[in-house]
């Protein structure tokens, strides 16, 4: 099974979401858990080299061919961290995904980029938005939630803006962040049954 973490826009929280989802999967007892890093920048791989997460195996797959092989060549749970902007690779990956988590931010140009991402996902594939680095209680967040709800796009999570999560590999995984991403993972996996 593969859970794709995808958005054609960069800087929205794909790598952070991928690492936290993989750690949440291990905590739920999934074995093996692969974090498939499809981004040529290899940010997930670098994160796990600096701060390994016990039970998570990193697989670098920066080309369409290696990504297809990685997604089909395992019998566990794959969390796939995708690159921004490579629409051909994203199209290929979404067609092989069992569920798609779409990290985004509240407001601005985010909506149009998520819509492009949604158009790539086959109709039968469960998908949901995760609003990352959310500033709780703001108009931007309220408007984003209202907009996605009106578009009938499930919101699988709202991850509050926190220094502990934003610190990335420089810090240990933030306990509250793990709990929030566990809820996202449950929603993604529930849609695959």
Identify the function of each model-found stretch.
Residues 2-12, 19-92, 166-171:
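P-loop/Walker-type NTP enzyme "switch/lid" segment
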Residues 46-51, 141-151:
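Short, aromatic/basic amphipathic alpha-helical patches
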Residues 95-96, 119-125, 148-149:
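Short, conserved loop/helix-junction motifs that constitute active-site signature segments
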Residues 111-133:
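Conserved C-terminal guanine-recognition region of P-loop GTPase G domains, centered on the G4
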Residues 135-137, 145-174, 187-192:
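Beta-strand-loop-alpha "switch" segments that mediate conformational coupling across diverse proteins
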């Amino acid at each position: 099974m593969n859970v794709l973490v995808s958005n054609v826009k960069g800087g929205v929280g794909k790598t952070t979401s991928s690492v936290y989802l993989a750690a949440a999967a291990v905590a739920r007892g999934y074995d093996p858990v692969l974090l498939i890093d499809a981004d040529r920048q290899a940010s997930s791989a670098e994160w796990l080299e600096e701060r390994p997460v016990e039970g998570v195996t990193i697989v670098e797959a920066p080309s369409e061919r290696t990504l297809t092989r990685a997604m089909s060549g395992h019998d566990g749970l794959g969390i796939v961290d995708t690159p921004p902007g490579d629409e051909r690779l994203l199209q290929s990956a979404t067609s092989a995904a069992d569920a798609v988590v779409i990290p985004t931010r509240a407001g601005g140009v985010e909506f149009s980029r998520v819509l492009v991402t949604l158009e790539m996902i086959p109709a039968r594939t469960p998908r949901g938005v995760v609003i990352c680095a959310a500033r709780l209680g703001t108009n931007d967040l309220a408007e984003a939630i209202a907009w996605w709800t009106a578009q009938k796009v499930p919101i699988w999570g709202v991850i509050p803006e926190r220094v502990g999560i934003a610190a990335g590999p420089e810090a240990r995984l933030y306990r509250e962040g793990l709990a929030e991403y566990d809820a996202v993972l449950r929603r993604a996996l529930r849609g695959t049954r």
